[in-house]
Amino acid sequence: MLRKLQPNAVLNVCGPDVRWCGNEAGHCRKAEWSVVPAELRDAERTASKSQQADDGEFSRKIDSQDEDIGSREVIRNARELVWYPSEVDTSIRTGWFYHPEEDTDVRTADELRDIYLDAVGANASLLLNIPPDTHGRIAAPDCASLAELGAKIRQIFASNVTEKAAIAADSAIAQHPITQAVDGMADTYWQAAYGQESDTITLKFQKPQKVSCVVLGEHLPTGQRIESGEIWADGSKASEFTVVGHKRICRFAPVDVLTLTIKITASRTEPTLRLLEVYQ
């Protein structure tokens, strides 16, 4: 009935579309893979699971609270894989419903900003619970925190300096040059040359630019591929990252840089990027 009445609805936890991240604190994994063993989707609907045979396929039980559910080691013996992205669920308050005595215990904008960056910026979606009060309205402390959160997010992404740089990649296929990673189009993307499972992208500025954030996104119609990478500023490592997926937000201490280098150090096949943005 849900599919019939709300065909675009996303079913979570006990549903087949997105999976619970495994906690209600707003945390997600260091490497949040969207491709996971199909048994995880069944585990979401089943309270208890029994081991069926003593072999590689059944020797490890998978559930949403496991730290590693998508690495090569985990999926190697899976009978079937599914696209099952993570959703981070948490509340702006200590609980899921409104209680007036909690008006002084609302999560701050700084806390919510960190949750946003750690979830949305790590290949997960974010479902933030904001309970209405007994009059059906959002309480004033919640509104104030949310308004400040919006301002903080806008500030982080206010100054995009990507267009100020000349961009190059060590390799690319002819149909998908590196310029397609920075053209702002959702359906164009860069892909490394065939056979490449690592690559380096270089952005060179004509004059020093203060940089503190890099946003990456893969071309998901061709799959989630990137496993790890590094960001270097004028020869010094500024940040490391694991999976990219829909979006990876890499924040680091502000640095004045002439040459910014993004090294994809491991990928399951030729890496792709549909999104590459650099912010002050």
Where are these regions (language model features)?
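Edge beta-strands of jelly-roll/beta-sandwich modules across compartments, strongly enriched
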Residues: 268-280
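Mature catalytic domains of secreted/periplasmic carbohydrate-active enzymes
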Residues: 1-197, 203, 215-217, 224, ...
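Short loop segments at secondary-structure junctions
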Residues: 208, 235-236
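Short proline/glycine-enriched turn/loop motifs at strand-loop junctions of beta-rich domains
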Residues: 208-209, 224-226
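Long, charged, low-complexity intrinsically disordered regions
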Residues: 237-238, 280
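Extended extracellular/luminal ectodomain segments enriched in beta-structured repeat modules
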Residues: 198, 206-213, 257-258
